[in-house]
Amino acid sequence: MGDTEKCNSDMIQRLHSSFGTTSSSIPKNPISQLDLNPNFIRSSAPQFSKPFSDSGKRIGVPPSHPNLIPPTSPFSQIPTTRQPGSHNFNPGGANHSRSMSQPNSFFSFDSLPPLSPSPFRDHDVSMEDRDSGVFNSNHSLPPSPFTRCNSTSSSSLRVGESLPPRKSHRRSNSDIPSGFNSMPLIPPRPLERSFSGGECADWSKSNPFVKKESSCEREGVGEREAMDDLFSAYMNLENIDVLNSSEADDSKNGNENRDDMESSRASGTKTNGSDTEGESSSVNESANNNMNSSGEKRESVKRRAAGGDIAPTTRHYRSVSVDSCFMEKLSFGDESLKPPPSPGSMSRKVSPTNSVDGNSGAAFSIEFNNGEFTAAEMKKIMANDKLAEMAMSDPKRVKRILANRQSAARSKERKMRYIVELEHKVQTLQTEATTLSAQLTLLQRDMMGLTNQNNELKFRLQAMEQQARLRDALNEALNGEVQRLKLAIGESSQNESERSKMQSLNAEMFQQLNISQLRQQPQQMQQQSHQQNHQNGTMATKSESNE
């Protein structure tokens, strides 16, 4: 116990030296007004790194349990504005207030089961109200287990009425280092059941705490030194190239969540493990606005009705460990839980508009194995987001893809040339076919004319053959007639010779006859006269006989 008290005083002194005395610190309640258990004062406030100390830091919230002081948690404070339906303790107007019911934006430990039940967390308390001590209370509340114990005043904090109970969780602080509060995880659901009004009355007495931190060095000096080393390493601009190469190696191994966390830390959007997401507004105000909006969304879901008292059971609850942070069973797709983009994470993404930028080309050459790609390949990669993301994890595959695209382009070009040549040949053949068809028509016309002439000649030849046959027949007829005439002429000449002979004989005989006749002429004359007379006589007789 002596060592623990010494350690607690040591931690409070360091806390005061880190943050100083602030005007918004919580006044301490006198011990006489609190029913404190000395067994629960062992855990002290965690150390905050000096680079994030600010005199204007916001303070914690009222205690969540009236009789117990569990170990304080540094992960429950989210800056938010006062809701219209919340209790208004300050008549002074719209002052900035803090709500205990709002979890951290992305992966705070309020989204995990808390160490102790806190049925009075759904309240927004103004910091100036606590400073001025305006709460005229009938009940004194001890310091909340989820507030920072950096106050130096001695006045007591009083509230006018008890806050409505809400759903509470239990969890262990020791398993997760403070640096993992930037991880966008969905908190695991604890086993829970509702209690009646009588059970809620006895719950605060019978519910034990789960786990208490006994060593102040685990959350104190160790976390502070670790976070100082992390920020000094990541904020060193000379190590950006080493970070890029290490992130590329981690992405090959599948640790993309850790890369996003480290790049967001390097950009200065996250603070050390003891600060909440709301307290980093001095580093990155835009990220703070996004975290406030997501915190308000989750607060509206986690609110319960004022009349319904819900308390967890005494059964065992799981605590999220480092190993479960990287399990793929948890949901990483909720857009409201994703952290705002930081320069560290955006440097790994390449858009087509960055293709002309020389700095992006240099970053690419460092990422892609120190200039493995040529300038033309770099332009193609930067023009395509998918290729750029793939080049981070597997540059050889991107190289193969680009080579395949080039070969495909060459083959396509050859194919197009071949198609053009074939089209030219087809056109040439078509023109030749047209000319040949024209010549063929002319030849067909000539052939038709020649066939007609041939037919005419055939007819004429046939006619001439007929004429020749007729001439031959005529010649034969003429030859026969000539022969017949010749024969006729030969017979006539013989007859003439015979006639000449006969005429000569007849002349001689006529001369002899004449001589003889001349000699016999008077005799003949007489005979003739006698014959005539005889004839006359006969004729006369005949005529007479006839008469």
From Swiss-Prot:
Keywords noted in UniProt: Coiled coil, Cytoplasm, DNA-binding, Growth regulation, Nucleus, Stress response, Transcription, Transcription regulation
Tissue specificity of this protein: Expressed in roots, leaves and flowers. Expressed in the root tips, lateral root primordia, and guard cells of leaves, hypocotyls and anthers.
Residue ranges with Pro residues bias: 63-73
Annotated GO MF terms: DNA-binding transcription factor activity; protein homodimerization activity; sequence-specific DNA binding; transcription cis-regulatory region binding
Biased composition (Basic and acidic residues): 120-132, 249-263
Region (Leucine-zipper): 422-457
Compositional bias segments (type: Low complexity): 279-294, 517-535
Biased composition (Polar residues): 15-52, 74-89, 134-157, 264-275, 344-356, 536-547
CDD domains xref list: bZIP_plant_RF2
Subcellular location: Cytoplasm; Nucleus
The bZIP domain, residue ranges: 394-457
Location of region: Disordered: 1-199, 244-312, 333-356, 517-547
GO CC annotation terms, alphabetical: cytoplasm; cytosol; nucleus
Effect of deleting the gene: Increased size of rosette leaves, increased plant height and increased length of siliques.
Keyword Cytoplasm: yes
Highest taxon of the lineage: Eukaryota
Entries under InterPro entries matching the protein: bZIP, bZIP_RF2, bZIP_sf
Further comment found in the protein's record: Plants lines expressing a bZIP29-SRDX dominant-negative repressor under a constitutive 35S promoter are seedling lethal.
Functional description taken from the UniProt entry: Transcription factor that acts as a repressor of reproductive development, meristem size and plant growth. Regulates meristem size, cell size and cell number during plant development. Binds to the promoters of the cell cycle regulators CYCB1-2 and SMR4, and genes involved in cell wall organization, such as XTH9, EXPA1 and EXPA3. Possesses transactivation activity in yeast. Possesses transactivation activity in plant protoplasts. Plays a role in abiotic stress response by binding to the 5'-CAGCTG-3' DNA sequence found in the promoters of MYB44 and TRX8.
Protein's name in the database: bZIP transcription factor 29
